[in-house]
């Protein structure tokens, strides 16, 4: 049994916990502790009730500063200094680092010094970590000596499996990406101050361009794609599910049917459970709570002049990513034991 702790219990932290109990991986992973500065009553309430994902299927109670879920008792901590967390006493194998602010190796090593054996960051990180993993594409690079690993981003997990499939079958020469991302909690409900002037504006009233490092994230997973991609991102007034508009120039001549065929085969084969394919006339809310990293919308595939291909990809940017956190952590332990 892997003993884990969650540091930072926001959207991703709570999704990780709920995904664990819904995924069938609870027999492999035990959440021992949650470190979150919010009040325990709020932690319990937001675990039980969620606007996006609905009510948690298990009853959650607060007893003696523990979250009780069935027979499981999860210690609730409120420690702002990661170096002071009781990971050694709790025998923590992996910390899910989900604060969104501890993103480099030196900061993550505070967890290691506190006694945790490994750290998995739920965010793109600095380049000095042991590895940035998109599960299903490069998790085989994990090694026993890796202590600090990044799970990349939800959009990197969405797009990289698709690029990988296209490159292996047709060769990818270059690409351009537009991420159409649901609003996030770094935006404002009504106009208010923010360092990014666009994010001073009400999230529910505008389509808001934001910076993205997605293209650089692709390069970290697929180094041979260096300088071949650029990306922009806009936030839209929905609370969950993201679409990615991907345009790629291929080395081989293709048509819509051949592109869709290789993606559907990959979804049913090598990337089963990670990549999906649909030809139904669906909309974003239909992918809410979908555990896969990416779903190709085959109805929107377009080909121009035989080599320029446009695709529409969907992902639940919370739930799919949380499930990959679980998968990557299991792969880290497997590598450590090999």
Swiss-Prot record:
Any GO MF annotation of the entry: erythrose-4-phosphate dehydrogenase activity
Catalysed reactions, semicolon-separated: D-erythrose 4-phosphate + NAD(+) + H2O = 4-phospho-D-erythronate + NADH + 2 H(+)
Residues that bind NAD(+): 11-12, 317
CDD domains associated with the record: GAPDH_C_E4PDH, GAPDH_N_E4PDH
Keywords in alphabetical order: Cytoplasm, NAD, Oxidoreductase, Pyridoxine biosynthesis
First-listed, main subcellular location of the protein, grouped into a coarse class: cytoplasm
Top enzyme class: oxidoreductase
PROSITE patterns: GAPDH
GO CC term (a single one): cytoplasm
EC number(s) on file: 1.2.1.72
Site (Activates thiol group during catalysis): 181
GO biological process, one term: pyridoxal phosphate biosynthetic process
Active site positions, chain numbering: 154
Listed pathway(s): Cofactor biosynthesis; pyridoxine 5'-phosphate biosynthesis; pyridoxine 5'-phosphate from D-erythrose 4-phosphate: step 1/5
Parts forming coiled coils: none
PANTHER family for this protein: GLYCERALDEHYDE-3-PHOSPHATE DEHYDROGENASE 2
Record-given protein name: D-erythrose-4-phosphate dehydrogenase
Lineage: Bacteria, Pseudomonadati, Pseudomonadota, Gammaproteobacteria, Alteromonadales
């Amino acid at each position: 049994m892997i003993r884990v702790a969650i540091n930072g219990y926001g959207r991703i932290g709570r999704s990780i916990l709920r995904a664990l109990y819904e995924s069938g991986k609870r027999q492999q992973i035990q959440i021992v502790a949650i470190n979150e500065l919010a009040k325990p009553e709020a932690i319990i309430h937001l675990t039980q009730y969620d606007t996006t994902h609905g009510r948690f299927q298990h009853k959650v109670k607060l007893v003696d500063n523990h979250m009780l879920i069935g027979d499981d008792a999860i210690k609730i901590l409120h420690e702002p200094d990661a170096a002071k967390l009781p990971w050694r006493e709790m025998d923590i194998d992996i910390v899910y680092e989900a604060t969104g602010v501890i993103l480099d190796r030196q900061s993550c090593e505070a967890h290691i010094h506190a006694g945790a054996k490994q750290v998995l960051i739920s965010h793109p990180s600095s380049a000095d970590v042991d590895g940035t993993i998109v599960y299903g594409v490069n998790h085989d690079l994990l090694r026993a000596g890796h202590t600090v690993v990044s799970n990349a981003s939800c959009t990197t997990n969405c797009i990289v499996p698709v690029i990988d499939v296209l490159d292996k079958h047709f060769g990818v020469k270059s690409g351009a990406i537009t991420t159409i991302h649901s609003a996030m909690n770094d935006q404002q409900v009504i106009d208010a101050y923010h360092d990014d002037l666009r994010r001073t504006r009400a999230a529910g009233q505008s389509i808001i361009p934001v910076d993205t490092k997605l293209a650089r994230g692709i390069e970290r997973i697929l180094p041979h794609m260096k300088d071949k991609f650029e990306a922009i991102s806009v936030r839209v007034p929905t609370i969950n599910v993201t679409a990615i508009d991907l345009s790629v120039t291929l080395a081989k001549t293709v048509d819509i049917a051949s592109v869709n065929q290789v993606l559907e085969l990959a979804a049913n084969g090598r990337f089963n459970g990670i990549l999906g394919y649909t030809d139904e006339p669906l909309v974003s809310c239909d992918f809410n709570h979908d555990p896969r990293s990416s779903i190709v919308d085959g109805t929107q595939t377009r080909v121009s002049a035989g080599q320029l291909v446009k695709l529409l990809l969907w992902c639940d940017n919370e739930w799919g990513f949380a499930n990959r956190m679980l998968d990557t952590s299991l792969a880290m332990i497997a590598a450590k034991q090999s």
